Amino acid sequence: AATLVTSWALNALTPSIPSGSGMQGLLANARSPLAPHEYVYGQVRKGGANTYLEATGDENKFLHMIITLAGHELDGIDSIYINDEIVTLDGNGFVTTGGWAENGLKVRIKKHLGAANQTVDTDLLAESNLITSDFKGQGIAYLYVRLEYDQDVFANGIPLFTAMVRGKKVGDPRTAQVNYSNNAALCIRDY
């Protein structure tokens, strides 16, 4: 009887882990310079691994982050979310909508699809103390995010950055073409 009561007490005091859908893990940014390469098929909203962080400027005014989305070229990065708010970017990557744009140009996000001929991000190269022209990220899809410190804008810390992406291009034996597809059979065949 004592074992039964002890077992019941432990179960009652142990927090339960929500089972939820598998998608919940995709909407996070883990900090890891050695994260495994992820394959992305079809269209999905996802976060990524923060594989690079650097602070620059007087009193570390700017925070530079690389958020790796996939270990291959993506067909496209359609939209960007800060926390759960979809944002619009201008031609230079600065956020121009929502609360993230109210106090000036505090957030810049640049999209990199991971093409085989991808070159280093010119803004990151110019503003970083550590990045060289060898940092191309060829074959790696990522977001380069620069935050300008503002206590009012970032009162709750670094926000969550996610993107709606179109995944890996896959071969179709029926047409002998390699294109983006959300056809499950073609994606499984590619994997």
Where does each model-flagged region fall?
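Polar, S/T/G-rich
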Residues: 1-191
